[in-house]
Amino acid sequence: MNKLSTKLVVAIGIGAALYGILGLWGFSIAPNTFIKPALAILTVFGALFGPVAGLLIGLIGHTVTDTIAGWGIWWGWVISSGIIGFSMGLIQKRVGFSVKNGSFNKGDISYLAITGLVGIVIAIIFAGAFDIIVMGEPFDKIVIQVLGATISDVIVFLVLGLPLTIGLAKSNKKHTHLKIEK
């Protein structure tokens, strides 16, 4: 089994703390469903540190949010945050992609967009199914939650997460078009 480096463990801790605390902030769009800008943390940290970090940041961070909020831990939604973080981190495995070094191309951005969107849809459907099957929640309520959560997460991903990740990568680019005059 691969060991987690100290740097990765620290990144997971910081990412989970940020995701957990920022997850308390948002505004309601459906029963128990909020637009939460914290999802952008999963995008950025996943792209920086990979799928394992994204998974753990999502799992730990969402558990922190639910614990602090006091509404109990909703494990289906905790797992869904882990799935989303994992999917955001898949981009880090692409050869030539690095947010840290500012190396990316349009194909990388498309890949992140697709894996992010697919991950969000799979994760939210999982959470809804979990709530119906395991938690005994009413189907009608869950349909509204799943639709609301999917729409809000897609919006946050496309409006905040993706642009922040691209902006961070651009700011880390090693070369410029500036020339030294002699």
Swiss-Prot record:
Main subcellular location of this protein, as a coarse class: membrane
Transmembrane portions of the chain: 9-29, 40-60, 71-91, 114-134, 142-162
InterPro entries, per database record: ECF_substrate-spec-like, UPF0397
Keyword Manganese (UniProt): no
Topological category with respect to the lipid bilayer: Multi-pass membrane protein
GO CC aspect terms: plasma membrane
UniProt keyword list: Cell membrane, Membrane, Transmembrane, Transmembrane helix
Domain of life from the UniProt record: Bacteria
Protein's UniProt keywords contain Thylakoid: no
Annotated localization: Cell membrane
HAMAP family: UPF0397
PANTHER family according to UniProt: UPF0397 PROTEIN BC_2624-RELATED (PTHR37815), UPF0397 PROTEIN SPR0429 (PTHR37815:SF3)
Family: Belongs to the UPF0397 family.
Protein name: UPF0397 protein BCB4264_A2665
